[in-house]
Regions:
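Active-site segments of SGNH/GDSL-like serine hydrolases
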Residues: 16-22, 41-82
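Active-site cleft segment of glycoside hydrolase catalytic domains centered on the general acid/base Glu
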Residues: 26-35, 73-76, 120
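Catalytic His-Asp segment of secreted/periplasmic serine-dependent ester chemistry enzymes
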Residues: 59-152
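Generic structural signal for well-ordered alpha-helices
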Residues: 36-41, 86
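N-terminal cationic-hydrophobic initiation segments that often serve targeting/anchoring roles
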Residues: 5, 40-45, 90-93, 145
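Oxyanion-hole/transition-state-stabilizing segment in secreted/luminal serine hydrolases
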Residues: 1-33, 59-61
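Loop/turn elements at helix/coil->beta-strand transitions in domains of secreted/extracellular proteins
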Residues: 8-13, 47-52, 96-99
Length: 152
């Protein structure tokens, strides 16, 4: 984290971390959020002026999984668990003066799952799945650019 984030001293930092912690029967929401909070604390300590954005977790679609290992994974990595984890991340934003970004509204199908056309196997996004995420993020990025006087 030092070389990839802290030494760069970014003015803005977007975190989308921890989704693999949602997998498996041993998932513990408090423990996962505790690890997430430790990372946020390190960032806040070393980069107090950095504008921090914490992202909601992407939804999944268990109906497109064909691999038996993935089907087992979806017993644990559910959209309900993802929503609960995202709510925990949102609570951290209030505690640490960060901003919560849910960029996922156009990723959902009518059943509340990740749209099948956006996913490889129900969990990871195809490139086209990132388009709606980027479309939701672009207004904020433009605003940041304007605030910095066009500096990137």
């Amino acid at each position: 984290m030092d070389e990839c984030i802290l030494e760069l001293q970014p003015a803005h930092l977007f975190l989308n971390i921890g989704t693999n912690d949602l997998n498996g029967p041993d998932y513990d929401r408090a423990a996962m959020l505790g690890r997430y909070e430790e990372i946020v604390q390190q960032i806040r300590k070393k980069l107090p002026e950095t504008k921090l954005y914490l992202l909601a977790y992407y939804p999944v679609n268990p109906t497109v999984a064909e691999d038996s290992g993935l089907i087992e994974c979806f017993r644990w990595r559910t959209n309900e668990r993802i929503r609960e984890a995202s709510e925990g991340v949102q609570a951290l934003t209030r505690k640490y003066g960060a901003e919560f970004l849910d960029l996922n509204k156009d990723l959902y199908d009518a059943a509340g799952n990740l749209k099948a056309e956006y996913t490889i196997e129900g969990m990871h996004l195809y490139a086209n799945g990132y388009r709606p995420v980027m479309d939701a993020l672009l207004p904020l990025l433009r605003k940041i650019g304007e605030e910095q006087g066009g500096k990137q």
